[in-house]
């Protein structure tokens, strides 16, 4: 089972669009499947993001909340709007060799 952390800025209230989010997540998960020669059923999503949890449930992919334990993480997919806390998390993922990719997102101005 490959455990994939899907993470975003902690105070970020939404995404540019659901369509963009799910397409991006699907593309990155396909990349992981190719790298590890596995199926989507061999992946477990770790996330506290409602959209990631909804995506996982809709696609019958196991998911669980991320408990800040980096030993539980095999790969990281990040959605980043430039928050300094998020940059630290991305740097940690890079230093551990876990980062799949980063998608830069814009904050909703509402």
Task: Give the ranges of each region predicted by the language model.
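Residues that mark the start of a beta-strand
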Residues: 1-5
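Acidic/glycine-enriched connector segments
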Residues: 8-110
